[in-house]
Each structure stands twice: as C-alpha cells, then as structure tokens.
A protein has these predicted regions:
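Intrinsically disordered, low-complexity RNA-associated tracts
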Residues: 1-33, 37, 185-191
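A generic structural signal for beta-strand entry/edge sites
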Residues: 64-66, 140, 174-176
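Short, highly charged
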Residues: 30-107
Length: 191
C-alpha cells in the first residue's frame, strides 16, 4: 500500500490544543467539617505512631474542594523526609482515608514549615537554570525522577521560556521531566 504523507484537510483549521481547567466541585460545609476532623485525627495519630511531637492545624481554604493542614513542632525534618517523600506519603494516605470515608471528594494538602512553597521556588530556579543550559548547548537534559506535583511545577515554570519545550518520560515512580531545545524557536532565530 502506498504510504504518502496525508495533507491536512483545508476545511478544518489546525488549532493548538488547550488544556481543560479542572472543574471545581464545592464541598458542603458539613462535608468539609467532617473532612477536617477525619484528616486532623488521622495525621495526629500518624505523628504519635511515628514518635514525632507535632500539632496539626487547619489553614484557610484556597479552593472550594481543598482542605489544607499545617503540621508544626520542634523537629519537622522526619515529617518532611528526603525531598518531601514522607510529607507526600502523609498527604497521600490522608487523602485515601478522607475520600474513602466521605461522599464528597476533598483534596488534601499537608505542609510543614512552609516546605511546599520553598520546594516550588527551588524547582522553578532549577527549571530556569537547566533551560538556560539547554538553550546554550542545544541538547536535551533529563531531570531527576519527580512526583506529578513537582513535574507540573517544572512544566509551568518553562511554558513561556523561549527556546525550550518540556515533556515527561518514564513510568511512576521514576517519571522524569525532559527539557529539550525547541527547534521551531531555533529555526525562527536563524531565519
């Protein structure tokens, strides 16, 4: 069979795909109160079993389906873990407990010592630094394995960075972000 390249149909314009924004489904006040008690009790119990002294408090909601918890105490290093792995595990387990017990879906965010914001800033700096290396060397660079939240930070930080494109490769838990030269930008630059 003849395999010639297909020509685009002229009656159908080619438009770039735009990612759909996640639809926020508000959680009822009663549901949020129940979620707050469940999550706080779960995380407090987990801290006790870990032998870590800490208090759990609720932070103000940012989005209508999100419950934010802050853990505070004298030594939060064991709670954060290596690159936030322990904190991510606490958040994941808390989410499972919440969403198995409730009729409504609640997104749980657990933080301590403002770790998540500091980590996001660190990842954004790393993304820009690596992107500049990619532009200079005209070679792709693959970052260390990251969780979906951290990969999203890298992609967002570089979406408007001229000369590079990003994509993820591999399978969980070893999925990585690749920062690659954007050839369309390079060709535009030359011509």
């Amino acid at each position: 069979r003849d395999r010639r390249p297909r020509r685009p149909r002229e009656d159908r314009p080619i438009t770039p795909s735009v990612p759909k924004e996640r639809e926020l489904i508000p959680v009822s006040e009663a549901g949020m109160q129940q979620a707050e008690k469940l999550a706080t009790d779960f995380v407090t119990g987990l801290l006790a079993k870990m032998g870590v002294e800490g208090q759990v408090k609720t932070l103000p909601q940012v989005e209508c389906d999100q419950l934010r918890l802050e853990i505070s105490g004298p030594d939060m290093g064991p709670i954060i873990g290596r690159r936030g792995d322990t904190l991510d595990a606490i958040q994941y387990l808390g989410s499972l407990v919440l969403n198995n017990a409730l009729d409504e879906h609640v997104r749980l965010s657990v933080d301590t010592e403002n770790y998540r914001e500091k980590r996001a800033e660190s990842l954004e700096r790393l993304a820009r630094k690596m992107a500049m290396k990619v532009v200079k060397a005209h070679r792709s660079m693959t970052l260390e394995p990251m969780n979906p939240y951290e990969r999203r930070i890298i992609h967002a930080a570089l979406q408007d960075f001229n000369g590079v494109t990003t994509y993820s490769t591999g399978t969980e838990p070893g999925r990585r972000v690749v920062i690659a030269p954007d050839n369309s930008y390079r060709n535009r630059d030359r011509g």
